[in-house]
Amino acid sequence: MGSGMSQILPGLYIGNFKDARDAEQLSRNKVTHILSVHDTARPMLEGVKYLCIPAADTPSQNLTRHFKESIKFIHECRLQGESCLVHCLAGVSRSVTLVIAYIMTVTDFGWEDALHTVRAGRSCANPNLGFQRQLQEFEKHEVHQYRQWLREEYGENPLRDAEEAKNILAAPGILKYWAFLRRL
């Protein structure tokens, strides 16, 4: 959790509160946009575009209502060829949940494959049970409309995210490793 931000897809990173204030690391990864999702989320650095979502890391916190604005923020950043850091305090639950919703929207992945994609880049990724339930509901009832909205709003995705994510999951041993961990 303290080893720096993790690249999930090209131009998309997950990190913690400390990473979001590390100007050198942000510059090195060409981060121009930061999505902060924690109790005291607010802009902290000059020259960075922010989306701040005040949210607690509790199972009762509704993150679903922030999916659309988060997806729009991340996608517009990446379409401009820039990089976005999504962070909460530890970079484990809230930020991971928003990135999973984004991956589900830009690919045909369900929430579990999207989680495995995130974990391939950030092994500590672990949305709380309430957020997992919200992602399951998003998969069942809303993700298809979000995919359609994204296509209508931005056209076909030139970022090749589905291909990138499938390559991540196809890496030797990734799914076997996560299946093993699930049994523990």
UniProtKB/Swiss-Prot annotation:
A lipid is attached at G2 (N-myristoyl glycine). The active site is at C88 (phosphocysteine intermediate). Its EC number is 3.1.3.16, 3.1.3.48. Signal peptide: none annotated. Pfam families: DSPc. GO terms for molecular function: non-membrane spanning protein tyrosine phosphatase activity; protein serine/threonine phosphatase activity; protein tyrosine kinase binding; protein tyrosine kinase inhibitor activity; protein tyrosine phosphatase activity; protein tyrosine/serine/threonine phosphatase activity. InterPro entries: Dual-sp_phosphatase_cat-dom (IPR000340), Prot-tyrosine_phosphatase-like (IPR029021), Tyr_Pase_cat (IPR003595), Tyr_Pase_dom (IPR000387), TYR_PHOSPHATASE_DUAL_dom (IPR020422). Monomer. Interacts with LCK; the interaction is direct. Interacts with UBR2; the interaction is direct. This is Dual specificity protein phosphatase 22. The lineage of its organism: Eukaryota, Metazoa, Chordata, Craniata, Vertebrata.
